[in-house]
Each structure stands twice: as C-alpha cells, then as structure tokens.
Regions:
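N-terminal periplasmic "start-of-domain" segments of outer-membrane beta-barrel proteins
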Residues: 36-69, 97
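Extracytoplasmic beta-strand/coil segments of soluble accessory domains associated
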Residues: 79-115
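Short acidic/polar hinge/loop motifs at secondary-structure boundaries
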Residues: 97, 116-143
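Short strand-turn segments of transmembrane beta-barrel domains in outer membranes
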Residues: 146, 158, 162-192, 203, ...
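Flexible loop and strand-edge segments within Gram-negative outer membrane beta-barrel domains
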Residues: 208-221, 229, 233-306
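Conserved C-terminal beta-signal and adjacent last beta-strands/turns
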Residues: 228-229, 519-617
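Outer-membrane beta-barrel signature, preferentially recognizing the C-terminal barrel domain
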Residues: 253-276, 388, 392-394, 398-456, ...
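Gram-negative outer-membrane beta-barrel transporters
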Residues: 319, 323, 356-358, 363, ...
C-alpha cells in the first residue's frame, strides 16, 4: 500500500471515529417533543416507510419543491443531494452522468414510474439525467447496494422518478420563460380529480442557442398520469413520460467544426393494477421504455427497448412483521450500427421481511435471485437496521450485495475498435454503511452523517489488443468509500436551509499492471448550501451554492474546482399570476466539465439569467 493510500485510509478511520463521537454527544441531549419527518419513502423497501424507521440512507424531493425552486430538469435537482454528483455542462439538450457514492452512471439504476432507463445500449440511464422537471410527484435517491430490490445496475444506488398523482380540484398552470442565449420555455401542466379519476399532465417546449458557437439545443417533453378507483379495493393506472432532444454538440475545444448533431427520443410507459384485501396488497405493473439515439460526425445510431412485468405482494402478518415478495420478468432489446438486433430475458424472484424487533428497533432482511439467459444467474442479499433512541437519535447500519450485467455493446459489438466479448460475466459488489440521524424541534432541525464503502470485483474494462483495436474483459476491481453529512433546518416559518457535504475516495485497480488510479470525474469533496426565504405570502427568494473539489480526468489529470451559485425568486401578484426570475452560474464561473487528450476541454455554460410569468386557473 502506498503512503498516499495509507494516509487516505487513516483519514477515513479518523472521520469514522469522529462520526461515532458525534453520536455519543448527540445521544446525551435531553429528548423533547415527538418529531415528524414528513414525506414517506418508497424506494428503500418497495413499501411506504417513514424515514425514521429506515436503516439505510435515502432522500426524497417532492415535486412541489422542484416547482418552487424552478428546477427545469433533473440535472439541477440532483446536484443538491448528498452522495450524488450530476456531471453536466448545463447546456440545453445535453445530458449528464449521475454518480452515487463514486459509482458511474452505468452502476446507478434509474427508473421512471417503474420503468428502468438503463438500457442494453445506453447503460448509464441517459433519459433520466435530462428529464423534465415538470409534473413530478417525487424524486427519490436510495444509496448503497439495492439489487435485492431491483436487480442489475443498482451498485451505487437507485434513482427513482415518479409522475405526480392528481389531487383536489382541477387546476392548471401556463409557464412562459425567456432568458440568456436566446432561450425560451413554454409549458402547460395540470392536475386534479374528476370523480374516481385522478389525473395530471404536462407538455413543454424549450430552445436555446446555448453559449458556444454551433451549440443550439431543442427539447420537447410530455407526461401524463391517470389513476382510477374501480372499487374500494382495486385501483388501476397508467403513466408516461417522453423526452425529445436535438442538440449540436461541440464535443471539445480540440474538435474542429462543425459540431456533432445528436438526436435522442425516449418514451417510458407503465400501467398497473393494485388490489387490497385486508392485510394483503398485490400490485401488478407492466412497463416499457423505448430509446432512439442518432449522432452525426462519427456516425452512431442506437435503438434500445426495455420491457418488464412485475408482480409484488405485500402482506402485513402482524403489527411487527410485514412480508414483501414477488417476481419480475424483463426483456432488453437493442442494436446499433456495430451489431444487429439482439435481445435478452431475465426472470427474478425476490423476498423481503420488514421487522419491528422492539420499541424503536426496525430490521429489514431480503434476498433476490436473477436468471439472465445471456449473463447467467446472480443471487443478492441485504440486511439493514435502525434503532431510535429516546433522545430522537436514530442509529442505522446496512450491508448488502449488488451486480451489473454487461450491456449489449460490450457483449456483441463487431467494431474492431471495441470488439464485444460474449463471455463477459456480471460485475459483483458488496457494500456497507453506518450512520446516524438526529432530530430536534419536532423535526424542524435535522442532521446526520453516514460512513460508507463498496467494493466491486470483475470490473468490465476496455483492453487494447493491437494498434487502435481493443475488446472488453472482466479484469479489474474498484473501491469507493467516504462520508456524507447534512444539516437541514426550518428556523422560522419563512426561512429554511439545507447544508450537505460529501467526501468520496474512488479508485480502480488495474490487476494486470498492479496499479491504482482514481476513477475519472468523481469529486473528492462536494459542498452544497440552499437557503430559501419567504418574505410574505407573495414573495419568495432562494439562493443555492455548490462547491466541487478534487476531480480528475482519464490519465489522472486534475480538473479545475468550481463554485456554482444560483438564485431564484417568485412574486405572486394574485392567485392567478406570478412573475419568476432565476440566475444560473451567477458568478460566471469558467470551469471544465470534462477533459480528454483526444477531444480537449469541454467548458460549462457561463452566467445566465431567465425571467418568466406563470398563469394559473
């Protein structure tokens, strides 16, 4: 072990010790009144759970907050969540890569209304990173190994997006926004109830020249959700989200014009039937995701689809025991211009027990078996627990395994530059975490920290052969460990704030050369601060700060740190009309999103200001 690695391991041990000391101090504080944590979390167990009972680290962001903060796409939403890094150049129409705990986008499972967006071609879940911020019900981030619940790719965690369920009297909002770089946005959305039918929808169109030459982007999106109560015990529903982008990508400052033209069309559809009989609830879900991608310049065309049938049973055996079990069938289809249409099926069985073992003690035990007809079988398991103390301190710990099946490109590509290997095996991972959460003043003030680690074996990597040719092999290993901490508070009714910090050490070991290097693009430190002030019932002002430190590109080349500041404001003239304004990259920070010796530096968008009007009826 090198001296540098020893120092990092020692730092990790010191921070873990400080975490334990903090818990001891906090648990000595006198208990106050009962606390309430607000929104439930579904993705951590596949059932509705209060955050105070969870033994793992998870966050939920409601659609109302996305609307209030004027996040126009998911890239901005994810930047404020601890343990998550959304790497993007901010240009309209471009995409981002979502990383959780140092794991790249292909090792983070993303889902929209139950449909997986990690496809056989685009394994990093391209759709959800640029997904529209309109008509969202909730965005959940569940960290750590989650293959026991969801199967392949859930190594670093799971990102779940849910379309809003209509509630109350029907109401509609028209949004129009103009801004820097000849940008405009038009959106119409609505939601409500009509008898036994709940409905919501949105349609939006955006265009921008963006900042660079030959860099224009266009994006259209839609969503809808319908839920209908057939009877007191049976509900059916259908939802869909679609994104259609057309983007001129300059690629990098070493790439000569013209820009590469990228067109991407993605549609996700899911439908469900849910029945309840006393203590037994069944939910049957069918989902489909279709994605088409076309790139000019270096011509690339990819077409992929995911199909899924999921049957989940939830049985409340007693007040202290809930069982969850079911089966999943999945089919992936895809092809690109290097290999013909291919498909793969997967059958899975899963089971989970949620146990209230004593006062304030909650345990979760689960297992799953996946059988891929191409990649083989894989069994995963997990266990986690939470202990709520009288001091309103929650201690928690979790351990589990996960895997990632190889995608079609790495299996079947016929290109000599990246020849597929049909003998690839799934990557395997094991992870653990320990942490605490502390609640004060009926949950108005919350703070906590988590120490985590996950190790990956049989890492699929590109292996050069001769000249510019190469293929793929299960050769290397990877390690991610670090610390997440947060403080959130509502000091007054008109002032709320959130502070989050993430430290991540992320490295891969080349087992053929016995060398270790930091994984590209992963920040060593992330700090985010969000403040929101409501001066009265009409005027809202918000300020967000994100500081990113310690990234490296391929070849261990340092990438510049950067500080992003955004502000937003809404003034409500009446129940029908509001004026909005937002500023992105307020300090006009000039920073590099990514760098390669081949294409050069990819700069991020600079200072941008937007103003708009909202009309409600």
């Amino acid at each position: 072990m090198t001296t540098q690695n020893r120092l990092r391991k020692r730092t990790f041990a010191i921070k873990a010790g400080l975490l334990g000391l903090t818990v001891v101090v906090l648990t000595s504080i006198k208990a106050g009144e009962r606390y309430e944590l607000g929104p439930y979390i579904v993705g951590a167990t596949r059932t509705e759970r209060d955050a105070s009972t969870l033994g793992i680290s998870a966050d939920v962001l409601l659609g109302s907050e996305v609307d209030r903060k004027m996040y126009r796409d998911l890239r901005h939403v994810l930047f404020d969540i601890k343990g998550v890094y959304s790497q993007s150049d901010e240009a309209l129409g471009s995409t981002a890569e979502v990383m959780i705990r140092g794991n790249s986008g292909s090792r983070v499972l993303t889902m929209v209304d139950g449909a997986k967006t990690n496809t056989s071609i685009f394994s990093n879940g391209r759709f959800i990173t640029g997904a529209s911020g309109f008509n969202l019900g909730r965005v959940e981030v569940v960290r750590g190994a989650q293959s026991t619940l969801y199967g392949s790719s859930a190594i670093g965690g799971v990102l779940l997006l849910e379309t809003r369920q209509g509630r109350g009297t029907p109401r509609y909002t028209f949004t129009n926004e103009l801004g820097s770089f000849n940008s405009f946005l038009t959106a119409f959305q609505g939601q409500g109830e009509a008898g036994e039918l709940d409905f919501s929808f949105h349609a939006a169109s955006q265009e921008s020249d963006n900042e660079l030459s030959d860099n224009e982007g266009k994006m259209k999106s839609y969503s809808f959700r319908l839920d209908y109560d057939l009877s007191e015990n049976t509900t059916v529903g259908i939802s869909s989200r679609g994104e259609f982008t057309d983007y001129s990508n300059p690629v990098g400052d070493l790439t000569p014009p013209p820009s590469t033209r990228v067109q991407s069309d993605t549609i996700a559809v899911s439908a469900y039937v849910k029945t309840s009989r006393e203590n037994w609830t069944q939910k049957f879900t069918a989902s489909m995701l279709d994605e088409y991608y076309r790139q000019t310049g270096f011509i690339y065309i990819g077409d992929a689809a995911n199909w899924s049938l999921d049957w989940q049973n939830t049985v409340d055996v007693s007040d202290s025991l809930r069982l969850v079990a079911g089966s999943t069938w999945e089919r992936q289809e895809g092809n690109d211009n290097s290999f013909p249409e291919s498909e793969s099926d997967n059958w899975a069985l899963f089971a989970q027990a949620e146990i209230e073992a004593g006062k304030g003690v909650n345990l979760v035990l689960g297992a799953r078996h996946d059988d891929y007809h191409i990649a083989g079988s894989k069994t995963t398991w997990r266990a986690n627990g939470a202990w709520e103390l009288p001091t309103k301190t929650k201690l928690r710990a979790a351990i589990g395994t996960a895997f990632r099946a190889p995608n079609f490109f790495r299996l079947f590509s016929t290109s000599s530059f990246a020849l597929g290997n049909p003998n690839l095996k799934p990557e395997e991972s094991k992870s653990w975490e320990v942490g605490f959460d502390q609640y004060y003043k009926n949950g108005a003030i919350q703070l906590g920290a988590t120490v985590f680690q996950n190790d990956i074996e049989d890492l699929v990597v590109y292996v050069p052969t001769t000249g510019f040719d190469g293929t793929y092999a299960n050769r290397d290993s990877a390690e991610n460990y670090g610390l997440e901490a947060y403080v959130s508070y509502q000091l007054k009714e008109n002032w709320s704030a959130n502070l989050a910090y993430t430290w991540t050490e992320s490295s891969a070991k080349d087992l053929s050369l016995n060398t270790t290097s930091r994984l590209p693009g992963v920040p060593r430190h992330q700090i985010s601060l969000n403040n929101e002030f409501r001066f009265d019932e009409k005027w809202l002002v918000g300020l967000g700060v994100n500081y990113v430190i310690g990234r490296e590109s391929f070849g261990s080349v340092d990438i510049d740190n950067y500080l992003l500041v955004r502000g937003y404001s809404r003034y409500r003239f009446s129940d029908a009309v509001s004026l909005t304004a937002r500023v992105e990259n307020a300090l006009n920070e000039d920073y590099t999103v990514s760098f390669s010796s081949f294409s050069g530096r990819v700069p991020a968008r600079g200072f941008a200001v937007f103003a708009g009007v909202e009309w409600r009826f």
